[in-house]
């Protein structure tokens, strides 16, 4: 089985389980299984997938088809171009949070001093970046 065949099978599985971003999710999960970025994956679709990589990929696909978030499957989430370790006991930071952090940073620059309290809001990534 080559990368393209594995990818197509992953796409079919996720699509049939009504995962909205079935193509993107399949690409991300296959790339991660192969320890490649998505660009390198897409440039090498004719390469053969090793058995252990295939097993990892379809394990990921089976978890995703049950609606487990990609961040929990991979164990990390990108936030402000940095990867942060994530697990099921931590809320996954959303892209809206990046916008909020950006707005807070702009406001802080306008004024001299601010006190910020971040309690029980999830991963703590917003406070780390502020």
Label every PLM stretch briefly:
Residues 123:
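Conserved SAM/SAH-binding loop
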Residues 1-57:
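A short N-terminal interaction module
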Residues 112-120:
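Conserved class I S-adenosyl-L-methionine
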């Amino acid at each position: 089985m080559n990368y393209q065949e594995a990818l197509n099978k992953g796409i079919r599985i996720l699509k049939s389980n009504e995962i909205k971003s079935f193509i993107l999710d399949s690409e991300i999960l296959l790339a991660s299984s192969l320890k490649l970025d998505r660009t390198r994956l897409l440039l090498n679709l004719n390469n053969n997938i090793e058995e252990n990589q295939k097993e990892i990929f379809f394990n990921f696909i089976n978890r995703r088809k049950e609606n487990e978030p990609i961040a929990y499957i991979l164990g990390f989430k990108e936030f402000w171009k940095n990867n942060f370790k994530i697990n099921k006991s931590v809320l996954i930071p959303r892209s809206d949070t990046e916008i909020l952090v950006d707005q807070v940073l702009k406001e802080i620059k306008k004024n001299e001093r601010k006190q910020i309290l971040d309690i029980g809001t999830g991963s703590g990534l917003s406070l780390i970046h502020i």
